[in-house]
A protein has these predicted regions:
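Catalytic glycan-binding domains that act on GlcNAc-containing polysaccharides
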Residues: 1-4, 11-172
Length: 172
């Protein structure tokens, strides 16, 4: 069942993969859930790894990296440094916004790892003086992280470097 879920994810069928995953883990005990979370992490299914690890964490402490993985380290470090923002803030937002699914699309139309709205992406491209911006590139990992960190920087600048207001403003 977990293998079928992975096959759905590999085909880009996120909803089907999620249903298959939930069906596959429904009867697992805590030790089996932990193994499933580790398996998901090994196969880069971080959204499933995190959500399954949360179920395990209700019963006993877990390794930090199962609950809080750090994928895309090079890109996040580079763009967070460029924007002069805390890398942990970027990871926290990305974890919450997309669970690290690069192809994520919200019901309101936010896209990619950092869940950037199309109009916001166009505005960011203009601010960054990117003349040939194509909306579909927002799903590219590097572009999404670049735009997301630039947007966070602009929010901090407008909100007096208040990270709480900037975090709230990110989803406003």
């Amino acid at each position: 069942s977990l293998e079928r879920a992975k096959a759905f994810y590999d085909l880009g069928l996120i909803a089907e993969g999620n249903r298959e995953w939930q069906w596959g883990i429904r009867t697992l005990n805590t030790a089996e859930l932990l193994a499933a979370a580790q398996w998901a992490q090994k196969h880069d299914l971080l959204h499933r790894s995190i959500n399954t690890a949360i179920k395990v964490a209700e019963h006993y402490p877990l390794e930090h990296d199962l609950l809080y993985p750090r994928p895309f380290e090079d890109e996040i470090e580079d763009y967070a440094e460029m924007a002069k923002i805390d890398i942990n803030w970027v990871y926290g937002l990305m974890r919450q916004e997309s669970r690290f699914i690069a192809a994520a699309r919200s019901s309101v139309g936010a896209n990619g790892l950092m869940q950037i709205m199309p109009a916001t992406a166009k505005w960011i491209a203009k601010e960054l003086e990117i003349d040939n911006f194509k909306p579909e590139t927002i799903y590219e990992i590097e572009t999404n992280i670049y735009f997301g960190t630039a947007y966070l920087r602009s929010l901090l600048d407008r909100l007096g470097n208040n990270i709480i207001l900037a975090t709230a403003g990110y989803n406003a």
